[in-house]
Design a protein with these regions (language model features):
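C-terminal alpha-helix plus adjacent terminal tail
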Residues: 1-11, 42, 161, 165-166, ...
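Conserved CoA-thioester-binding segment of acyl-CoA-metabolizing enzymes
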Residues: 1-54
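Hydrophobic/aromatic residues within transmembrane alpha-helices
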Residues: 16, 51, 63, 112-114, ...
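Hydrophobic alpha-helical membrane-association signature
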Residues: 31-35, 79-82, 227
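Glycine- (often His-adjacent) and acidic-residue-rich active-site loop
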Residues: 45, 53-89, 105, 252
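A general structural signal for well-ordered alpha-helical segments in protein cores
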Residues: 64, 83, 142, 151-154, ...
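Crotonase-fold acyl-CoA enzyme core
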Residues: 88-201
């Protein structure tokens, strides 16, 4: 692994940290390639990945200086291809991804939040899409918020270039929780530890179902049948479900049983 992405192994979960603090963790080509390598190394290794940034920024998007240099050199200033790879690497990864949004998240940073399965932000985090100021549509973060937010809230981010705080992002449903900065990593890693207690196959199949059902299925019966198929795949992959019912019948609690958020 290089120096632009830092990885900490924590047992059943890992913390992957964007590590360009001098650039507010803007993602140049080299950082995107290292990030893809880090994601690949976590396949079949950890059940959960916490994604965060070094110092006071989560990710300020693409490296605009590199993009501008490319334009002057005649290189097409379009980082789309490897951003698509990053998008697919997270969404198709078997692990559950948790964004720990520790500060500024602009453009590509907002994309990373949308891509992750769960997200916790500092109350003061700043999330925004500056692309309209460059006469551009946010081609990755825009679709993400349009899927996850109401149309007016998505339009606010896309059309005004104004940033919202982590607290507002929680109220809008863009993140699950907003917490004081000092508590962010403690909360994110505690959540990672709780999620990592569950069966790996069940986590992966549930992740896939959470994405597939809203996007592909609009009829209740088909949705229920899809859910039945998901559980069949989990059962066929091992005996985790049988073990769970056996624990319950013997008077033991399964992870998550009998507790609220």
């Amino acid at each position: 692994m290089g120096t632009l992405i830092a990885v900490e192994e924590k047992g059943d979960y890992a913390v992957i940290r964007l590590n360009r603090p001098e650039k507010k963790n803007a993602m140049n080509r080299a950082a995107r390639r290292e990030l893809l390598d880090a994601f690949g190394a976590q396949r079949d290794r950890n059940k959960v990945v916490v994604l965060t940034g070094t110092d006071d920024s989560f990710c300020s998007g693409v490296d605009l200086k590199e993009t501008g240099t490319d334009a002057k050199d005649g290189t097409p200033p379009d980082p789309s291809s490897d951003w698509i790879e990053v998008t697919l690497a997270i969404r198709e990864h078997p692990a559950i991804f948790i964004a720990a949004v520790n500060g500024i998240a602009l453009g590509g940073g907002a994309t990373l939040i949308s891509l992750c399965d769960l997200a916790i932000a500092t109350q003061e985090a700043e999330i925004g899409m500056p692309e309209i100021g460059f006469a551009a549509y946010p081609q990755f973060s825009g679709p993400g918020v349009q899927i996850q937010l109401t149309s007016k809230r998505a339009a606010w981010l896309v059309l005004t270039a104004e940033r919202i705080t982590g607290a507002t992002a929680e109220a809008w449903g863009l993140v699950n929780r907003a917490v004081p900065r000092a508590a962010l990593m403690m909360e994110a890693e505690a959540l990672a530890g709780r999620v990592a207690r569950f069966d790996a196959t069940a986590l992966t199949e549930c992740k896939r179902a959470l994405e597939a059902i809203p996007q592909r299925i609009s009829e209740w019966r088909a949705a229920f049948e899809y859910g039945i198929d998901v559980n069949a795949r989990i059962r066929n992959a091992g005996n985790a479900q049988q073990q769970g019912f056996a624990r319950f019948e013997s008077g033991l609690r399964n992870p998550g049983q009998g507790k609220s958020c």
